[in-house]
Amino acid sequence: TEYKAGDIMSGENVSHVWLSLGPCNDGSVVILHSSPSGVHISGTPTPKGIENSQAIDLANKYMDKYYPVWNKKYPVKPFDYLEKYSQFRWYDNVLYDKYNLKNMYADNVMKIIFEEK
C-alpha cells in the first residue's frame, strides 16, 4: 500500500482511525491519531517490522519539541498501523491540496504544518 499525507485509514477489525502525515524513505509512516490518553503524532515501524524507523524518530522529534510534557507522559509507541486498514484518499477535484502535501515525504509535511523553514 502506498501512503500519502492526508490519507484516512480505518481499522478493519478494530475501531480505530488515523490520518497519514506522510511516508518516510524507509517505508514507515508518520501518523496523527487519538487514543484514550489523547491525540498523538506517532510513527509506524517499517513494512518489515523494524521499530527503529524514520517515522518514529520524526514523531518523537516533533512531540518533544512542541508537546514535551505530553510526550513524556505518553511517549510515542511503535504500533503497526500498516496492515488491516482500509484507505480513503481525497483527490484534487474534491479537496484542493494547496501545498501538494500528498506528494511530499513526512519530514517536509511536518515543516509546513509547524511553519518551519
Protein language model regions, located:
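Low-complexity, Gly/Ser/Thr/Pro-rich intrinsically disordered linker/tail segments
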Residues: 46-117
